[in-house]
């Protein structure tokens, strides 16, 4: 994420400080447009996020299309870890769900680690494919 603000790392650190049950902190933003729902390059987060709250526990992440009327949260691939959680995560082999979706955070969920996500206003530009790279070059 070439244009990520340091505030994003701070938001992860704040979430770890605020939520004692949180092993791994990450960020989400509301979907940018309806095409995000079916775009496999956009990782979607399913959250236990009570109405009016700005952070909650992540239940699942997927590249697949999400259906329904609820909000679609676009995952921002920035993480903050508690030391013990990072050590356990790094020592574990890739999990079945991780291999299926090609999403490393699913290994943590399968291990029983809690991932919490804070909502941010807008996802920074991510470079995940050649079109994203061209967009980043145009902004640089």
Label the model's feature ranges:
Residues 1-3, 124:
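A short, conserved beta-strand element in the Rossmann-like catalytic core
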Residues 72-140:
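Conserved alpha/beta core of the MobA/IspD/sugar-nucleotide pyrophosphorylase nucleotidyltransferase superfamily
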């Amino acid at each position: 994420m070439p244009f990520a603000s340091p505030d994003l790392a701070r938001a992860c650190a704040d979430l770890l400080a605020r939520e004692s049950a949180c092993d791994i902190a990450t960020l989400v933003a509301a979907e940018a447009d309806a095409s995000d729902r079916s775009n496999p390059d956009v990782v979607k987060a399913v959250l236990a996020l009570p109405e009016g709250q700005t952070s909650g526990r992540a239940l699942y992440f997927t590249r697949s299309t999400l259906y329904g009327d609820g909000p679609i949260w676009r995952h921002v691939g920035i993480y903050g870890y508690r030391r013990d959680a990072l050590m356990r995560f790094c020592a574990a082999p890739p999990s079945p769900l991780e291999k299926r979706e090609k999403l490393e955070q699913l290994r943590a969920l399968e291990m029983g680690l809690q991932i919490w996500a804070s909502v941010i206003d807008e996802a920074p530009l991510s470079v995940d494919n050649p079109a994203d790279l061209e967009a980043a070059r145009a902004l640089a």
